[in-house]
């Protein structure tokens, strides 16, 4: 996956949040 998504996930955000943030 992309770094943005990995970083988002490590921050404790859920999948949908990371898709919106990084998509």
Swiss-Prot record:
Q: Which superkingdom heads the taxonomic lineage of this protein's source?
A: Eukaryota
- Select a single GO molecular function from the record's annotations and give it: potassium channel regulator activity
Q: Where is this site: Basic residue of the functional dyad?
A: 19
Tell me where it mainly resides. Answer: secreted
Q: Where in the cell is it found?
A: Secreted
Tissue and organ distribution: Expressed by the venom gland.
Q: Please cite one Gene Ontology biological process associated with this protein.
A: killing of cells of another organism
Q: Which Pfam families match?
A: Toxin_25 (PF08095)
The entry's keywords:
Amidation, Antimicrobial, Disulfide bond, Fungicide, Ion channel impairing toxin, Neurotoxin, Potassium channel impairing toxin, Secreted, Toxin, Voltage-gated potassium channel impairing toxin
Positions bearing Cysteine amide:
22
PTM entry text:
The two disulfide isomers globular (C1-C3, C2-C4) and beads (C1-C2, C3-C4) do not show activity on Kv10.1/KCNH1/EAG1.
Disulfide connectivity for this sequence is 4-22, 8-18
Q: What is this protein called?
A: Potassium channel toxin kappa-KTx 1.2
The root-end lineage is: Eukaryota, Metazoa, Ecdysozoa, Arthropoda, Chelicerata
């Amino acid at each position: 996956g992309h770094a943005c998504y990995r970083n988002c996930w490590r921050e404790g955000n859920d999948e949908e949040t990371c898709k919106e943030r990084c998509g």
